[in-house]
């Protein structure tokens, strides 16, 4: 019979020391914590945790070994009005578990009870935590440490990026191993990608609503166990765990000079609202882990049913420990924080919130690339430009301005220029660098670039919500025909805008983020919220990729890396050599001139050598070039023996870059 000794309140979680396992669990309001050990047949042994130090319950299992299955039952008051929902009938996941065995189905036994505790036992249905102890030979792996000024981010989903790649063996497609395959790495290197940003690879589950419809949470933002690698993206090869496979992928990408950023979810948990499953924090210490209203209800500032209370001292440390685990165990180079405003809630947003202070004080984490999605749906949730130094931020104002300028004719050139210059009014005055602006035209959430040019309306019927989900404010333009089938004249305009938007993105000051597939002409058939589509709608179709567009994109990224004004990560100042703003006659734009003349035409001289010519009108135009000898440059022309230009005639919706002869 297993017996627990007192053990130690540290280290946190389940830790194998070579002789046994030390178990710890935080709960400030529990009356008793019971460790539940399971054998291979699922038989359960319950052992009361013998010691408590502060709010940490702990015990040591002599002779315990890696592979031990376990969970917890936590007893205490069931008093929803005070925020307490303890229920020992529910087996609970360790919030720090580093591996889980099993899946969470749509099972009524997970119900914890709304006003009264549900007494059905959930142990048989719940995945079991696994104690793991996996050493790994990193073979001298070092982070690529790409300067922010040279960073080009590529946002991708593990499965969506690799599932249909013809040069990756079928048994590896859709997995972490596929990320390490030479064919995938060659694509990233050919494009010029410096940083791969992966949608969540933390252990996530499918909401009951989706399971009832036969769908899944494809994006992975419904995280249950943030310390655990999701096994759904593992190849299942014998002897290779999901953790090892992810490590192999990171090591291979690092060897190719490519950074890896993980999209992490700490704004809410998979327990959803009061009617959701009791799986972890709700049953461990609901009042400590979640933001609650005065009457004990969940403060749903995320739109996902609950919001994690990241300003609580223990919850803050839980996040810091989790990030350090991913950094140390998987050598990741940074993190993108979903609904990042929640990180700073106290409950109002505060730049000096405990989690921000803890990140800044941690030498290892503060050296990582940290990216925030700067909003949630709560009061005061929109915080673009307000995150502390050390963070970069997804810039939706850049996105909407560039779409509006090129596709709708609704944005004047002054607004275009302000956002082309890394949205300087948002970031420069607050002491941030240009790289703080994560520029994007598209992201996983919304239309793909091609769909932006083919659909005026969203087409999300496959999501099972009668097309109610997804944004209606897309700033798109189908050029007179809804859908992918259109005549040659419409496609000519679409392709011109496709290249114009890519050029704008990759030659703007700030940090560009390219959505995987946009360089290939990937379409989701007008679905702008494909979060539950784990199928060919979201998987990149490499066989039909637009090869010319891929070459065009790669040429743009190479061009970007040559222009000091874009790579030095310093603000452009009036009169310096970084930028000159010119009108269609090649003359400097005065303050008054910005508001006069055609608002969709502009010339931008970068680093005194590269001239960006912009015609966002729906008609051809002629521009007079500034003094000097100008010639075409890839991907806009061939410089060898090229004609020296004094004027440029640009078709509708076009952008071009010329280079000045030495």
Swiss-Prot record:
InterPro entries: GlgX_C (IPR040784), GlgX_Isoamylase_N_E_set (IPR044505), Glyco_hydro_13_cat_dom (IPR006047), Glyco_hydro_13_N (IPR004193), Glyco_hydro_b (IPR013780), Glycogen_debranch_bac (IPR022844), Glycogen_debranch_GlgX (IPR011837), Glycoside_hydrolase_SF (IPR017853). The keyword Hydrolase applies. Coiled coil: none annotated. GO terms for biological process: glycogen catabolic process. NCBIfam families: glgX_debranch (TIGR02100), PRK03705.1 (NF002983). Belongs to the glycosyl hydrolase 13 family. This is Glycogen debranching enzyme. It comes from Yersinia pseudotuberculosis serotype O:3 (strain YPIII).
């Amino acid at each position: 019979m297993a017996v627990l000794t007192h053990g130690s309140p540290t280290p946190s979680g389940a830790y194998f020391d070579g002789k046994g396992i030390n178990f710890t669990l935080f709960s400030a309001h529990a009356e008793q914590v019971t460790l539940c050990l399971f054998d291979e047949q699922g038989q359960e042994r319950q052992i009361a945790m013998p010691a408590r130090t502060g709010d940490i319950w702990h015990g040591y299992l002599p002779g315990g070994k890696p592979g031990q299955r376990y969970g917890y039952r936590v007893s205490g008051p069931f008093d929803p009005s005070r925020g307490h929902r303890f229920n020992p009938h529910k087996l609970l996941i360790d919030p720090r578990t580093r591996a889980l065995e099993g899946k969470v189905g749509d099972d009524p036994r997970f119900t914890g009870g709304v006003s009264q505790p549900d007494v059905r036992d959930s142990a048989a249905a719940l995945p079991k935590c696994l104690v793991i102890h996996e050493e790994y030979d990193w073979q001298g792996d070092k982070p690529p440490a790409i300067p922010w000024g040279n960073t080009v981010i590529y946002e991708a989903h593990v499965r969506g990026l690799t599932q249909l790649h013809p040069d990756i063996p079928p048994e590896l497609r859709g997995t972490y191993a596929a990320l390490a395959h030479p064919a995938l790495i060659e694509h990233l290197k050919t494009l010029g990608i410096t940083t791969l940003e992966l949608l969540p690879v933390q252990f996530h589950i499918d909401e009951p609503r989706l399971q009832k419809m036969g769908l899944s949470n494809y994006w992975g933002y419904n995280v249950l166990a943030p310390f655990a690698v999701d096994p759904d993206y593992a190849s299942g090869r014998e002897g290779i765990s999901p953790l090892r496979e992810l490590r192999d992928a990171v090591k291979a990408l690092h060897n190719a000079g490519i950074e890896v950023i993980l999209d992490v979810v700490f704004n809410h948990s998979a327990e959803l609202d009061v009617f959701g499953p009791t799986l972890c924090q709700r049953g461990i210490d609901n009042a400590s882990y979640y933001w609650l209203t005065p009457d004990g209800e969940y403060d749903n500032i995320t739109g996902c049913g609950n919001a994690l209370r990241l300003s609580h001292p223990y919850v803050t440390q839980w996040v810091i420990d989790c990030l350090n685990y991913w950094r140390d165990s998987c050598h990741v180079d940074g993190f993108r924080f979903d609904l990042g405003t929640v990180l700073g809630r106290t409950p109002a947003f505060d730049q000096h919130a405990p989690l921000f202070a803890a990140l800044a004080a941690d030498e290892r984490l503060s050296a990582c690339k940290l990216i925030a999605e700067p909003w949630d749906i709560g009061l005061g949730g929109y915080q673009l430009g307000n995150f502390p130094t050390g963070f970069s931020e997804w810039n939706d104002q850049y996105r909407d301005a560039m779409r509006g300028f090129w596709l709708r004719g609704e944005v004047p050139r002054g607004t275009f220029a302000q956002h082309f210059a890394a949205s300087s009014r948002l970031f420069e005055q607050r002491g941030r660098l240009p790289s703080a602006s994560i520029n994007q035209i598209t992201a996983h959430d919304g239309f793909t670039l091609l769909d932006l040019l083919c659909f005026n309306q969203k087409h999300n019927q496959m999501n099972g919500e009668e097309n109610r989900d997804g944004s209606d404010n897309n700033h798109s333009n189908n050029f007179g025909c809804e859908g992918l089938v259109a005549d040659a004249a419409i496609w000519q305009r679409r392709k011109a805008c496709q290249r114009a938007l890519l050029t704008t993105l990759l030659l703007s000051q700030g940090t560009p983020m390219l959505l995987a597939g946009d360089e290939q002409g990937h379409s989701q058939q007008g679905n702008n919220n494909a979060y539950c589509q784990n199928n060919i709608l979201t998987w990149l179709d490499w066989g039909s990729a637009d090869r010319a567009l891929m070459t065009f994109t790669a040429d743009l990224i190479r061009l970007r890396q040559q222009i000091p004004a874009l790579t030095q990560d310093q603000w452009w100042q009036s009169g310096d050599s970084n930028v000159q703003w010119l009108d269609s006659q090649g003359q400097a734009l005065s303050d008054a001139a910005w508001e006069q003349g055609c608002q969709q035409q502009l010339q931008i001289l970068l680093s005194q050598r590269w001239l960006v010519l912009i015609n966002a009108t729906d008609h051809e135009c002629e521009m007079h070039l500034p003094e000097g000898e100008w010639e075409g440059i890839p991907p806009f022309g061939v410089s060898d023996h090229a004609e020296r230009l004094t004027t440029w005639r640009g078709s509708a919706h076009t952008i071009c870059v010329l280079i000045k002869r030495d």
